[in-house]
Curated annotation (Swiss-Prot):
PANTHER family reported in the protein's UniProt record: 2-METHOXY-6-POLYPRENYL-1,4-BENZOQUINOL METHYLASE, MITOCHONDRIAL, METHYLTRANSFERASE
Recorded name of the encoding gene: ubiE
One biological process term in Gene Ontology: aerobic respiration
Record EC number: 2.1.1.163, 2.1.1.201
Pathway the protein acts in: Quinol/quinone metabolism; menaquinone biosynthesis; menaquinol from 1,4-dihydroxy-2-naphthoate: step 2/2; Cofactor biosynthesis; ubiquinone biosynthesis
The protein's name in its UniProt record: Ubiquinone/menaquinone biosynthesis C-methyltransferase UbiE
Species of provenance: Rhizobium johnstonii (strain DSM 114642 / LMG 32736 / 3841)
Length: 258
């Protein structure tokens, strides 16, 4: 879980994968990871999920069911390459406007380039900012989405509080994230894949295994489904639920600002 702890010398520390690092260092380390993988991010997701992330994202968009009417506004956080935002805009019949927010400029650059090629630039705004301090007024969005990004935020509680703040009354939060496998045999298989195969595939694809090692470790440090649902409730959300995908390899969390 990404929560701060006091170190032996009295400073505050948080987890970066299986390592403990000073609070102020995690964001910079995470940024380095995503600068390295930005241009191969979709391949990275294929490796991390054994290709299943595409079906999970489709299920997320189906759950959101974006309105097919002008004025529907979605904030997609940690969505730099645009994958989720593109799906939302298309599912709305190109009526929705999606603001793609990411702290990493390299990821946003990839997304903006793809948006232009898809002729979706008019439906999208790309913003470089921190999920813990969103540069938007309260009640600005109908929906807030984040896919495979919340576990990389140093202060998850702050990000959830900000999500609640910027949503309109009646707005919805959807968080898709790797989670805790709830099937013993699958758990063993997925662990073997994660710790043995994923870093090596990453090295073969990008020449660097370290980003993939961090990403695998960050999944194991993330709160399980029940604990993360409790964090969402603590941020003020109502009707909080989660749905497991592929035996809990991933989970979709939902909450409403009522």
């Amino acid at each position: 879980m990404s929560e701060s702890r006091t170190s032996a010398d009295g400073g505050m520390e948080t987890s970066y994968g299986f390592r403990e690092v000073p609070d102020g260092q995690k964001q910079g380390l995470v940024n380095q990871v995503f600068h390295k993988v930005a241009k191969r991010y979709d391949i990275m997701n294929d490796v991390m999920s054994m290709g299943m992330h595409r079906a999970w994202k489709d299920a997320m968009i189906s759950a959101l069911n974006p309105r097919k009417e002008p004025g529907y506004k979605v904030l997609d956080v940690a969505g730099g390459t645009g994958d989720i935002a593109f799906r939302i805009v298309e599912a709305s019949g190109r009526q929705a406007h999606a603001t793609v927010l990411d702290i990493n400029g390299s990821m946003l650059g990839v997304g903006a380039e793809r948006a232009e090629k898809k002729k979706l630039s008019g439906n999208l705004t790309f913003v470089e900012a921190n999920a813990e301090e969103l540069p938007f007024e309260a009640g600005s969005f109908d929906a807030y989405t984040i896919a495979f990004g919340i576990r990389n935020v140093p202060r998850i509680d702050a990000a959830l509080s900000e999500a609640y703040r910027v949503l309109k009354r009646g707005g919805r939060l959807l968080v898709l994230e790797f989670s805790e496998v709830d099937m013993p045999l699958l758990d063993k298989i997925y662990d073997a894949w994660s710790f043995n195969a994923i870093p090596q595939f990453g090295k073969a694809i990008t020449g660097d295994a370290e980003p993939y090692q961090y990403l695998v470790e960050s999944i194991r440090k993330f709160p399980n489904q029940e604990n993360f649902a409790a964090m969402i409730r603590q941020a003020g959300f109502s009707r909080v639920t989660f749905t497991n995908y592929t035996g809990g390899i991933a989970a979709l969390h939902s909450g409403w600002k009522l």
